Regions:
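Amphipathic alpha-helical "coupling" segments that flank catalytic cores
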Residues: 1-178
């Protein structure tokens, strides 16, 4: 397919343990899904479907994956089509959440953090963000950085927790806020 599969050791061990006669089969998905951050697509492929994503020589995610069948089929295209059909709704979900979250600024989520407990004695995630923002500004000032920019980064640092993408794909925490 012109790329290299990400043969994650942990996933490879898991997949080979699940299959008595492992046979790799390549599959594809619509290129339109590549508009979603690659981390979300990879999380879907590896975490939810146990597929190996394929990357091009520059490290960009391709619209290909490798799945492992449990037999040498006389009709591998049937297995391929079945796996392509299974991943499509999961990728569509990721795309939907990405597009919905894109309709709002990240900062729009900050007030929702008031309803998320960080720790009983330490308050909410909102209060933690306020403390982190103040600390970041102080540190930036002390090292000759931009305190205003550091404060803003601290304020935004937890906002992605309230995005639909992170609610659906918790492993995207810290990535969606970029």
């Amino acid at each position: 397919v012109g790329g290299v599969a990400d043969l994650d050791d942990k996933l490879l061990d898991e997949v080979t343990a699940l299959n008595e006669w492992p046979v790799p089969i390549d599959g594809t998905f619509e290129e339109d899904f590549l508009s979603v951050p690659p981390e979300a697509l990879v999380a879907t492929m590896k975490g939810h479907q146990k597929y190996f994503p394929v990357f091009d020589k520059t490290g960009g995610l391709m619209n290909h994956f490798i799945t492992i069948a449990n037999l040498e089929s006389q009709q591998p295209e049937v297995i391929r089509e079945g796996n392509e059909r299974v991943i499509r709704p999961r990728l569509a979900d990721a795309k939907f959440f990405w597009e919905q979250d894109g309709k709002h600024r990240l900062f729009d989520h900050i007030q929702k953090l008031e309803h998320v407990v960080f720790q009983n004695q330490l308050g909410s995630m909102f209060e933690k963000s306020v403390r982190v923002a103040a600390l970041a500004a102080d540190i930036a000032e002390g090292i000759g950085g931009d305190p205003k920019l550091a404060r803003r980064a601290g304020e935004l640092s937890r906002c992605d927790l309230m995005t639909q993408m992170v609610v659906e794909f918790p492993e995207m925490q810290g990535i969606m806020g970029r």
